[in-house]
UniProtKB/Swiss-Prot annotation:
<dbReference type="GO" id="GO:0016491">
    <property type="term" value="F:oxidoreductase activity"/>
</dbReference>
<protein>
    <recommendedName>
        <fullName>Putative NAD(P)H nitroreductase YdgI</fullName>
        <ecNumber>1.-.-.-</ecNumber>
    </recommendedName>
</protein>
<keyword id="KW-0288">FMN</keyword>
<dbReference type="InterPro" id="IPR000415">
    <property type="entry name" value="Nitroreductase-like"/>
</dbReference>
<feature type="binding site">
    <location>
        <begin position="161"/>
        <end position="162"/>
    </location>
    <ligand>
        <name>FMN</name>
    </ligand>
</feature>
<dbReference type="InterPro" id="IPR029479">
    <property type="entry name" value="Nitroreductase"/>
</dbReference>
<comment type="similarity">
    <text>Belongs to the nitroreductase family.</text>
</comment>
<keyword id="KW-0285">Flavoprotein</keyword>
<keyword id="KW-0560">Oxidoreductase</keyword>
<dbReference type="Pfam" id="PF00881">
    <property type="entry name" value="Nitroreductase"/>
</dbReference>
<feature type="binding site">
    <location>
        <begin position="72"/>
        <end position="74"/>
    </location>
    <ligand>
        <name>FMN</name>
    </ligand>
</feature>
<keyword id="KW-0520">NAD</keyword>
<feature type="binding site">
    <location>
        <position position="199"/>
    </location>
    <ligand>
        <name>FMN</name>
    </ligand>
</feature>
<keyword id="KW-0521">NADP</keyword>
<feature type="binding site">
    <location>
        <begin position="14"/>
        <end position="16"/>
    </location>
    <ligand>
        <name>FMN</name>
    </ligand>
</feature>
Length: 209
């Protein structure tokens, strides 16, 4: 359920929260809603390569704990930790995505046919490393949107990059060659307010030509 639609409050009130109220659980229905809203994020050629592993059971968290040894508080107290992956087989879903766009009236059939033909040729010769770099960017976009969506629902998050990326896919039965780790996101009800942080001024980080 949406708690606020005030975008500035959502964005500027976001904090990286490490300690959560362990009594607060997020239902599968609400988590599904949060993920659906987050996946309105943009992606290259609308391939939507993001994949989510929602780790919310005691057994799942027990598996995750040794892979995130420096982030134990987030793992143990959060409602869930979402492992965000990027799918190297992203091109496999283009037919489904573009066909559904035609069915829903978002795209004419002739545009879909032309796009699929061009994209099929593109992906056949696309170097794996270039595809990997692209889907990681897409994974970052959806992760940021997920954090903001969580805030709209009244929850807080913490993006985690310090974990065992080499072994997380296989630990949870996923193909490590196919699923590229993007980040972990803890989510739940903050037990602490978190800290405000300084941002560099625009004069330092931007220039006009």
């Amino acid at each position: 359920m949406i708690k606020t639609n005030d975008f500035m409050e959502i964005m500027k009130g976001r904090r990286s929260i490490r300690n959560y109220d362990p009594a607060v659980k997020i239902s599968k229905e609400e988590m599904t809603e949060i993920l659906e809203e987050a996946t309105t994020a943009p992606s290259s050629v609308n391939a939507q390569p993001w994949r989510f592993l929602v780790i919310d059971s005691p057994e799942g968290k027990e598996k995750l704990a040794p892979l995130a040894s420096f982030n134990q508080t987030q793992v143990t107290t959060s409602s869930a930790v979402i492992a965000v992956f990027a799918d190297m087989n992203n091109a496999d879903y283009l037919e489904e995505i573009y066909s559904k766009a035609v069915e829903l009236g978002y795209m004419p059939q002739e545009v879909k046919d032309r796009q699929i033909a061009a994209l099929t040729a593109h992906f056949e010769k696309l170097p794996a490393q270039v595809n990997r770099e692209t889907i990681l960017i897409d994974g970052g976009l959806v992760s940021m949107q997920l954090m903001l969506t969580a805030r709209a629902h009244g929850y807080d998050t913490n993006p985690i990059g310090g974990y065992d990326k080499e072994n997380i896919a296989e630990t949870f039965g996923l193909d490590k060659e196919r699923y590229v780790p993007v980040m972990l996101l803890s989510i739940g009800k903050a037990a602490d307010e978190g800290y405000a942080s300084y941002r560099l001024p625009i004069d330092t980080i931007a220039e006009w030509k």
